[in-house]
């Protein structure tokens, strides 16, 4: 796996699924391929994106700044600086300085990532802030190692909380989660179906599912009534795809 592929993988792992994620993936691909060279416009676009947490925006801004060639005097962006200040905690800043000194001795992406993984997310963000504010310099490879270590930590904590939700025994949470998944699967079906004539059936199934979820939410139902809703939808989607000769496992 190439370095940039690895960076893209880690960065996208912390972006919530949805149309915005696809947009960000495209922007990253363009930047890494040298197709997007307007850093100013890129940062302005990033700043106004909804849904993303300030830290995610800060990390993306840091990656864009590392990758897109820019004039030396280009102004640093406040939204990135604020996100990478380690919540203003002086302990984070102290640890970030220690980490920075260690990173200065590293020359490889993997070496930097290994060193960085033993620090807290706050310290890692502060260290990125140091480099972003030009208070310290490391090679691009080492900076990417720092980025990926930070993303790995964030993705780990997201995964833990996701697992807790999936394994929760609270029937109300499980019920709502099934309905949300059914709703997003229906939305995805509508997108995949596109505008072909054969797509009418898939659109109909998706539309019915969304109406059912809406009705269940409006009148309130027994928590077990949503069991199998998403699976039924996926079965319908896969049957439709087989007929269309399309194979899309990614909704699983």
From Swiss-Prot:
The record's Gene Ontology biological-process terms are:
viral budding from plasma membrane
Q: Which UniProt keywords apply?
A: Host nucleus, Membrane, RNA-binding, Viral matrix protein, Virion
Highest rank taxon of the organism: Viruses
One GO cellular component from the entry?
Answer: membrane
Membrane topology term reads:
Peripheral membrane protein
Read off the InterPro entries from this record: Flu_matrix_M1, Flu_matrix_M1_C, Flu_matrix_M1_N, Flu_matrix_M1_N_sub1, Flu_matrix_M1_N_sub2, INFV_M1
Q: Which Pfam families match?
A: Flu_M1, Flu_M1_C
Region RNP-binding, annotated ranges: 165-252
Q: What does this protein do?
A: Plays critical roles in virus replication, from virus entry and uncoating to assembly and budding of the virus particle. M1 binding to ribonucleocapsids (RNPs) in nucleus seems to inhibit viral transcription. Interaction of viral NEP with M1-RNP is thought to promote nuclear export of the complex, which is targeted to the virion assembly site at the apical plasma membrane in polarized epithelial cells. Interactions with NA and HA may bring M1, a non-raft-associated protein, into lipid rafts. Forms a continuous shell on the inner side of the lipid bilayer in virion, where it binds the RNP. Determines the virion's shape: spherical or filamentous. Clinical isolates of influenza are characterized by the presence of significant proportion of filamentous virions, whereas after multiple passage on eggs or cell culture, virions have only spherical morphology. Filamentous virions are thought to be important to infect neighboring cells, and spherical virions more suited to spread through aerosol between hosts organisms.
Which protein family is named in the record? Answer: Belongs to the influenza viruses Matrix protein M1 family.
Assembly and binders: Homodimer and homomultimer. Interacts with NEP. Binds ribonucleocapsid by both interacting with genomic RNA and NP protein. May interact with HA and NA. Cannot bind NP without genomic RNA.
Per its record, how is this protein called by name?
A: Matrix protein 1
The gene designation is M
